[in-house]
Amino acid sequence: QVEGAVLKGQKNPQKLPVLKNIQSCFVYNSARKVSTFESSNRIFNAAHRLIEKAVRSNMQSVFTDCPHREKLGWLEQVHLNGPGLLYNYDLTAYAPQIMQNMADAQHSNGAMPTTAPEYVIFEGPGMDAFAESPEWGGSLVIFPFMYYETYGDDSLIKKYYPNMRRYVDYLKTRADKGILSFGLGDWYDYGDFRAGFSRNTPVPLVATAHYYMTVMYLVQAAKMVGNDFDIHYYTSLAQDIMVAFNKCFLHKDTAQYGTGSQCSNALPLFLQMTQDADEQGNYRPDADLNEKVFANLIKDVEAHGNRLTTGDVGNRYLIQTLARNGEHELIYKMFNHEEAPGYGLSLIHISEPKRLLSISYA
């Protein structure tokens, strides 16, 4: 939008400046590119370029997830896209700023908003889920470990350990017998319905799994800072959450979690929560249960024609769980096509220079 001027050749009764030419510049963060990707697959190469363009568009002073519309620093992108960001860019200057933004946005009671900086306060009927969600706020605890695993630099963990602990303590106040029941869940999951709030997977399952994840990371952080009391306290808390999770969501007769959706089963598999009580009532990893839940996950993907049904949150855990278990051919089938859901769909409808990553696969 241009105001206070007219294009060359247009009427100009007010004698405004005349624009002879306008040049648009692609501006993004100065984080240095550190890797390249090239394969023999046309779809994968184009998808990588598509994603790269989307990432650069969102890498401003704040890492946003929507550069043309909301322009807010939605926090789930930080850890869900964290591995891809760290593989592709040098974030040694950018990541500390992201962490400081989160620390500054943290509320006095330890709560984390869904965006940082928190320029917008989500209030009113139906807006609670947008105000705070464990899958979003959890970036405060999860992302420093991604940074550490990439660079071997534990400074973010040590500096923000008090913030991380305050957030976990806050989540504990929101839990009912170990279960969290608020937030956006597997936002924008895929199916024969209008995308938005999670439909395939229960919100409490996704929220509680992320609660468990943040506590487990905090235990690691406590070991790194040498806080013995916190090590024991949060290890016990993690165990309580894991037990509550399995009691609430595991269907032993079918070896399914929650609704049996891809996200429902992928999350506990990814987090190694597939545990069961022994004769003494102690929960331990159950290899047989893990195998059966994983088999059900594969069956569901195949039942959907080798297509995913996960959303913004579940995508990462689905792909990582399949990859960890050697299902590379299945992952290939899931993305080597030009149908929805998949990146290939947008590649056949729009020419390369104008091609952008859409908000959904539909």
Features from the language model and the residues they span:
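Surface-exposed acidic, glycine/proline-enriched linker/cap segments
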Residues: 48, 52, 195-200, 351, ...
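Catalytic-core region of carbohydrate-active enzymes that cleave or remodel glycosidic bonds
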Residues: 314-344
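Acidic glycine/proline-rich low-complexity segments
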Residues: 32-36, 40, 334-347, 351
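Single conserved hydrophobic/aromatic residue that forms the stacking wall/gate
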Residues: 348-362
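Substrate-binding groove/exosite segments of carbohydrate-active enzymes
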Residues: 1, 9-173, 182, 314
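The feature captures the catalytic groove of carbohydrate-active enzymes
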Residues: 60-62, 66, 109-140, 172-308, ...
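Structural helix-adjacent loops and short alpha-helical linkers that scaffold large soluble proteins
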Residues: 9-17, 86-99, 106-109, 148-165, ...
